[in-house]
Amino acid sequence: MRLASSSTSLPVPAAGHHPLPLTVGVLGSGHAGTALAAWFASRHVSTALWAPADHPGSISAIKANEGVVTTEGVINGSFTVSASDDLLAVIRSSHLLIIVTRADVHDSFVSELANFNGELAEKDILVVCGHGFSMKYERQLQCKRILETDNSPTTSKLSDKKKCKVNIKEMKASFGLSCFPIHRNDVGVIDLPEDIKIIFAQLFTARIIPIPPLQVLFFSNYITHAVAAVMNIGSVRDPVNSLTKRAEQWLLELDERTPRAETGFFFYGEGSNTYVCKVQEQIDQERRKVAKACGLHLNSLLQECNDEYGTDYATLREYCLAPSPHNVHYACPDNMEHRYFSEELCSLEDIAAIATITKIEMPLTRAFINIIHAGKGNFPPTDKTSSVIGNFRSGDLIRFGATIFVKDEKMK
């Protein structure tokens, strides 16, 4: 199936308030960005795809392939998007701009968008895996509203060297969505505006749960990713040119005697064994205690995992061993700049900053922050945070959805 849409000319929306047909601009062409662009095209949504010039994703390959993205998995076929390197044209052509990139490079995307603030006044910006995007950047972007998902709506992976083919392994059964400025229904409960509900019904089949922007920041990905990555840090190869010649020779000899697995490493199935899962559950307790101090009720890590995939795993270890979607491809950090270290460090530090504001102790979480900094060579690790949330006060948290502050209340 191929949708008739030029890879060079961008669709121009009619004037007015989010008229149909909907047009979207996906900013970021990595695994998730490419998958979502193809998914939207499969749902007959006119889709433009943009990425910065130095982006390592698929944009150049898709442009060379005349905008065609081939998918396998949940959907199978070839779909055409408008691949563009002209951000202004994408902004003007789109009702909804969708940022799909690592949280640790949000700064650069915001800088690009801020150059066109005059064009953003009537635009909504959706940030996939928001990591507290609205809390950090709402003053820098003069857009209509900032929407954030708590997790990626898709589990996907670019599956060919040309980067024009993507395996969409799963589309999530549910995910949380926030809106800033916060919208409440007639009885004062946090909700989504009606026009946003209409748009998301067109984009996704998932059950979408309205949540406050603050709750997005608490999503548990950092636990499943960073904790397992740190506890398997010995599997990460030494940095290039970091070894002496003698050490390099000995490493080669070790590899010859006991070769590292040629087939790869299943990060979830092999990297999150029973002992790692126990640590993850303890860090989850710290996460939920800090959230509760802000008036937020969070499900357990295991329940969040089951909710997003519509599954009924009895234990976290069972979830990590399930064949699909996390044990379909080998995926393990190969350096300290991998997102499981660098991106999730942002989440760890954000939540630690909130813990400081709410005066809740989270020693295990802070230990992982320090270990990641130490592994990156940032000596000595300190309690100082690079998170802008470190400058917040309780009133700032209330603005983004906190309601109460309770110190040291024991989790049940």
Curated annotation (Swiss-Prot):
The keyword Nucleus does not apply. The keyword Oxidoreductase applies. It is an enzyme of class 1 (oxidoreductase). GO terms for biological process: glycerol-3-phosphate catabolic process. It catalyses: D-nopaline + NADP(+) + H2O = L-arginine + 2-oxoglutarate + NADPH + H(+). Pfam families: NAD_Gly3P_dh_N, Octopine_DH. InterPro entries: 6-PGluconate_DH-like_C_sf (IPR008927), 6PGD_dom2 (IPR013328), G3P_DH_NAD-dep_N (IPR011128), NAD(P)-bd_dom_sf (IPR036291), Opine_DH (IPR003421). Signal peptide: none annotated. GO terms for molecular function: D-nopaline dehydrogenase activity; NAD binding; oxidoreductase activity, acting on the CH-OH group of donors, NAD or NADP as acceptor. Its EC number is 1.5.1.19. Homotetramer. Belongs to the lysopine/nopaline/octopine/opine/vitopine dehydrogenases family. This is D-nopaline dehydrogenase.
